[in-house]
Regions:
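Charged (often Lys/Glu-rich) extended helix/loop segments that serve as interaction or gating elements
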Residues: 1-118
Length: 118
């Protein structure tokens, strides 16, 4: 089964570049047993935009919140605006408390430095 996330290689190029491997879970369905292996693809128009190949998850449903664990400290530095996608926020979690440390970009942020034609 294929699950398409709203992230991808523009914010985490490590699986495509280095074959980095991650574990994932559906945040609100942690107690449900896996249904079958799921491949998690990103949203870029690239055949290599796959974040995880065949990970055991419950049957994904629209709106599920996917968590990919321990993606690393360098993802933000490696992220780009490829395909004009805004970069995500960075959230630190400590003792069950979440804190945003970098706000997510908007499309206006991505386009702000473009110079219109004369």
């Amino acid at each position: 089964m294929l699950f398409r996330s709203d992230g991808g290689m523009y914010e985490n190029p490590r699986p495509a570049l280095y074959q980095a491997r991650y574990e994932a879970a559906l945040a609100e369905r942690l107690d449900e047993p896996p249904a079958r292996p799921v491949t998690i693809a990103g949203r870029c128009c690239e055949s290599g935009d796959v974040l995880i190949w065949e990970t055991p998850l419950p049957e994904p449903r629209p709106g599920d919140l996917l968590v990919i664990f321990s993606t690393g400290a360098y993802n933000y530095a490696m992220a780009s605006n490829y395909n004009r996608y805004p970069r995500p926020a960075i959230v630190f979690v400590r003792d069950g408390q979440a804190r945003t440390v970098v706000e997510r970009e908007t499309l206006d942020d991505v386009l702000a430095r473009d110079v219109p034609p004369a």
